[in-house]
A protein has these predicted regions:
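Beta-propeller blade termini and top-face loops
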Residues: 2-263
Length: 263
């Protein structure tokens, strides 16, 4: 349509009767920021557009988030105790200049057939959602916060009533948000969260600082303490990625973005 509107053909009769068809790009899928799997169903959230669902392990796909207030998806989770309950955190988490903000957390109780916004609209960018293994109404959200402005609606939030109310259970500072939250596979009261000091400015990007680090809670998120014991600290620590080995749940791996080579 843009081509037809902007170009004048010297010999229009050459294309009379031809039908327009999409020819590409076909190999550019954009930014995939969230994946959740429940049986044969796979959910994929794109940073630049929509939540997609496959019911046949990825053979075919369809969008299921077209009519909501935000199109950038940063997190998606399926309730382990009820696979019809889906949670989506909007606002992508790459935090680039082109990163789109979201409109909070959305929930579906019918497998994605319908959605409702359940709050945290001012969190802007959500990095992770974890749902309690036995209670689909209890969830934790890692919110990064506004990309360009220091704000307080960031950190880890918890709901115990399906999103009707939220409690900010981990807050570090107006420039430090939470980009990840991980649950211990054998103990849902043990949670780990990644705090990330980040602020994008018009002329450059601050993506590291002393506020970045890993926190742990042993009581379902009510209280947190920062972990040390070998993890890098200081002005040059950036984003951290966490992973727990399910076959050996006392083993955790951390990938640290550090501007100090010896960290």
């Amino acid at each position: 349509a843009a081509l037809a509107a902007s170009c004048t053909l010297s010999e229009p009769q050459r294309i009379e009767g031809l039908e327009w068809r999409a020819i590409g790009p076909r190999l550019c899928a954009g930014r995939i920021e969230a994946i959740a799997v429940a049986g044969d169903r796979v959910l994929v959230g794109a940073g630049s557009g929509n939540l997609w669902q496959s019911a046949d392990r990825g053979t075919s796909w369809r969008p299921i988030f077209d009519h909501e207030a935000a199109f950038a998806v940063g997190a998606v989770a399926v309730a382990p105790s009820d696979p019809e309950v889906l949670w989506v955190g909007t606002g992508e988490v790459l935090m680039a200049r082109s990163s789109y903000a979201g409109a909070g957390v959305f929930r579906s109780d019918d497998g994605g057939g319908s959605w409702r916004n359940v709050g945290l609209e001012d969190s802007y960018h959500i990095g992770r959602i974890v749902v309690h293994p036995h209670d689909p109404d209890t969830a934790w959200v890692a919110a990064i916060g506004h990309n360009y402005t220091q704000t307080e609606p960031r950190g880890v939030f918890r709901t115990r009533d399906g999103g009707a109310t939220w409690q900010q259970v981990l807050y570090v500072s107006p420039r430090v948000g939470a980009v990840d939250v991980v649950m211990h596979p054998a103990d849902p009261d043990t949670l780990y969260s990644v705090a990330w000091e980040h602020e994008r400015r018009a002329w450059h990007n601050v993506d590291h600082g002393p506020g970045s680090g890993v926190y742990v809670s042993k009581d379902g998120g009510s209280h947190w303490r920062r972990l040390g014991g070998g993890l890098p600290t200081g002005e040059l620590v950036g984003r951290v990625g966490l992973g727990i080995a399910r076959s050996q749940p006392e083993t955790m791996y951390a990938i640290v973005d550090s501007h100090e080579r010896d960290a």
